[in-house]
């Protein structure tokens, strides 16, 4: 609790000092949420409550970088740069946008025993501008390498700007830097992998990667996914199951560290199917169990009241 007060009357004002949590580094550009709650009791003894949240930070501007998780070298990576107030209102800003190739570790680091999932996944939820602790198993912590692209940017009244950058297969980090109206630096970052789906070799030194352009497909199309390992050699066991029946089961190819998994989707597969991946290396099991949605888009329910 930051402050509290009592009042009498039909209007009131609350003033408090929005002090930061000093255990959170200012370098991470944190945003703090302060919630004001009021309990009002009328003359009959009935109490009503309401609350309002206020956001405060070291800067008056927030910036983000967005891009789809699935990227291939066949087409440019499309980035969306956004600058907003801490309350999410669009704000115009200008600055620089750069893309760096990352310095990969000399060898693949196996996953920690405490983790129950592959040690790196897109959209892990880490704050975009947070600098994680050095960890060769976590690409978000890898050091920056050579600059691949650098350019100025300017968001307009909408607070957004779209850019496209052609990139070869590999792993990169996009970095944005701008300033708020008080001249304080605001940053954002996004780690991105670009894949070459025609290659037999997975180019990033992580133990296990499983990705797909879409996890919802329609009958008449083909589901596509990619499995890869950064080890010099490695094979995974792949199973595709539908309604407790195995559609296909196979080992990824010998002599390759990247495999494209494809499955033709039929009408009979509506409701979805499951892709299971089993890969074991250096006493670590990397297991995937992903449901691919095949929606009942051919069925429509209409409800009417008369």
Please tell me what each predicted stretch does:
Residues 1-306:
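A structural signal for beta-strand and strand-to-loop patches characteristic of beta-rich domains
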């Amino acid at each position: 609790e930051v402050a509290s007060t009592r009042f009498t009357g039909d209007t009131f004002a609350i003033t408090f000092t929005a002090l930061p949590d000093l255990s959170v580094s200012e370098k991470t550009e944190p945003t703090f949420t302060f919630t004001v709650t009021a309990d009002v009791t009328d003359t009959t003894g009935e109490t009503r409550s309401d609350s309002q949240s206020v956001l405060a930070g070291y800067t008056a501007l927030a910036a983000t970088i967005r891009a789809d998780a699935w990227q291939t070298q066949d087409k440019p990576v499309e980035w969306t740069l956004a600058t907003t107030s801490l309350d999410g209102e669009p704000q115009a800003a200008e600055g620089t946008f750069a893309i760096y190739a990352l310095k990969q570790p000399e060898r693949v680091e196996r996953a920690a025993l405490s983790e129950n999932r592959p040690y790196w996944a897109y959209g892990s939820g880490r704050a975009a501008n947070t600098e994680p602790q050095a960890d060769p198993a976590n690409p978000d912590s890898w050091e920056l390498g050579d600059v691949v692209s650098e350019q100025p940017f300017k968001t307009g009244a909408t607070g957004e700007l779209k850019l496209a950058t052609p990139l070869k297969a590999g792993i990169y980090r996009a970095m944005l830097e701008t300033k708020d109206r008080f001249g304080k630096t605001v940053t954002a970052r996004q780690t991105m992998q670009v894949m070459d789906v025609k290659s037999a070799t997975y180019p990033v030194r992580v133990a296990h990667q499983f990705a797909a352009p879409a996890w919802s497909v329609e009958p008449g199309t083909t589901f596509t996914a990619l499995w890869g390992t950064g080890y010099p050699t490695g094979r995974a066991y792949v199973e595709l199951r539908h309604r407790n029946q195995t559609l296909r089961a196979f080992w990824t190819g010998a002599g390759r560290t990247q495999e494209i998994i494809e499955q033709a989707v039929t009408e009979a597969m509506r409701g979805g199917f499951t892709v299971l991946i089993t890969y074991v290396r250096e006493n670590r099991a990397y297991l995937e169990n992903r449901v691919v949605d095949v929606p009942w888009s051919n069925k429509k329910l209409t409800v009417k009241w008369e």
